[in-house]
Amino acid sequence: MSEVVVANNANINPSAAAAVGATSVALTLGGSSTYDETSDFEGGYLVVNDATGEGRVYSINYNSTVSAGTALTVYLDDAIETALTTSSEVTLVKNPWADVVIAAAGHVHFAAGVPLVTVGSAASVPQFFWAQTWGVCGVWDDAATAIGAVLQSGTTAGQVEVGDGAAQPVGVQLYTGVDGEYYPKFLTIAP
C-alpha cells in the first residue's frame, strides 16, 4: 500500500506565481511535513485543485530538500500550461509505488499491488521488490469468498476480503476462496 497521505500536502498556495512555460513551482509547506531527499516526490504529481489553473495535473521530476514550514520547489516533467498565481491551490501526490507499506486494517492507503515475495514490515533499510497490479494472482483470503466477489484489502495485513464499497477495489475472486488460503484473483489495481 502507498504510505498514508499527508494532510499538509493539500490545498497549498504557491509562494510565487508560475508563468506559462515554467518548469518549477515554489511552495511553502505547513505543519510537520519534512522532505529530506530530492526524490520524495519524484514520479508523483502536482494537481492544481482550485483557482487559476485548476484541473491541471503535472508529473513531478524531482523536488528540493526542505524541512517543515519552509519553501519546497517541485521541478516538473512538462511546462506549466496555465499560469499559477499565489491564490492557486495545489496538492502534492507522491508516486503511489514509492515508500509502500504493508496493508493494515483501516484501508487508509492506495493499494499498490501484491508482492510475490515476502517483504519485511519493520525493515530499517528500503527493500526493493516487484508487485503485481493486474491479472491472475494467488492472494491470501481473509474469509470464505464467493466467485465473482469484488475484493479489497483485508483486516489482516496481506489478506483480501469482500469489498464493502468504502475502500479501493483490488480485484475479483476467480474461485471460491477459503479463509487463510491463497486462491486465484484477477487483480484490477493498475493495468
Cite the ranges covered by each PLM segment.
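Extracellular receptor-binding modules and their adjoining Ser/Thr/Gly/Asp/Asn-rich linkers
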Residues: 1-28, 32, 37-38, 54-191
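Short conserved beta-strand and strand-loop elements enriched in small hydrophobics
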Residues: 43-50, 90
